[in-house]
Amino acid sequence: RSSEIEYVVSTPEKQEERHEGLKRILARLPLASPLDGYRIVSDFGKRIDPINGRLAMHEGVDLTSEPGASVLATAPGVVVFAGWNGTYGKMVEIDHGMGVRTRYAHLNSIVVEPGRKVAARTEVGIIGSTGRSTGTHVHYEVLVEDQHYDPVKFIKAGEYVFSKN
């Protein structure tokens, strides 16, 4: 009850402080697409695996664009992996803090190295088809506390939060 009263009578400075804190958190979340101009070719969730024909969980979203398109970090963070990762092929993983990580897989080439701090929209690689892949795309994953979430929901949230309307 007293917290409600404190909130109601909080000073403009406290409200501004809360607002700035929220802006800092939003700025660290992956609320953008890793490609400028993209088409979804395979959604997040259960699907028929295009290689073996069996029902399987697809823990990311596959996005395609023009050949040679840059793959961009969707939020600031630190590159924790950049290299070959089995069925993912050439892959980059970024830790954004707060338990949030993103993965960018099947890249044709990688232009960052582990330990590098990256800003949002920093190029991390070039779209490709390495590893277990059936065509040129980026397989994009969002993990929160090691749980996979639908990346499209993050992209759409960013479009909503940062829209000018």
Regions found by a protein language model. Give the residues of each.
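Catalytic cores of peptidoglycan-degrading enzymes
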Residues: 27-165
